[in-house]
């Protein structure tokens, strides 16, 4: 299920367009996640009181978390599936501390693709989208495997 060199080139090529503005991309991903899947917001005590779109948009914590999420994802993507060292601590914290279900990873990965497509329509064509979806599926599957190692079946 691995990606070809060409697919990784697509993934890393678009990621190079995302990286200069991780904050805006990350903020949009988190806001969209909470809007489309409100149950995900309930996992974050610090975001529970942000009940309007304006509150989410003006929250420095939402911006910070979005940046953190995309920074971690970028480090993992750049490893081109040799991401054990990056993935293990992320999976451990999400499985044992935060208890984030794998389904939520699926939600956020779908949203990441949509946000990139909206922000970079001319650079994120069908081949790049397919490659990114494949890379994110690989990430989710590897996270799910690690979850099992940590005894979390989420």
From Swiss-Prot:
The residues that hold nitrite are 65
Q: What is its main location?
A: cytoplasm
Name of protein:
Myoglobin
Top-level taxonomy: Eukaryota, Metazoa, Chordata, Craniata, Vertebrata
Q: What's one Pfam family here?
A: Globin
**Stated role:** Monomeric heme protein which primary function is to store oxygen and facilitate its diffusion within muscle tissues. Reversibly binds oxygen through a pentacoordinated heme iron and enables its timely and efficient release as needed during periods of heightened demand. Depending on the oxidative conditions of tissues and cells, and in addition to its ability to bind oxygen, it also has a nitrite reductase activity whereby it regulates the production of bioactive nitric oxide.
Does this UniProt record's set of keywords contain Transport? Answer: yes
EC number(s): the record gives 1.7.-.-, 1.11.1.-
Give start and end of each Globin domain: 2-148
Keyword annotations for this protein, in alphabetical order, are: Cytoplasm, Heme, Iron, Metal-binding, Muscle protein, Oxidoreductase, Oxygen transport, Transport
What family is reported?
Belongs to the globin family.
Amino acids binding heme b: 94
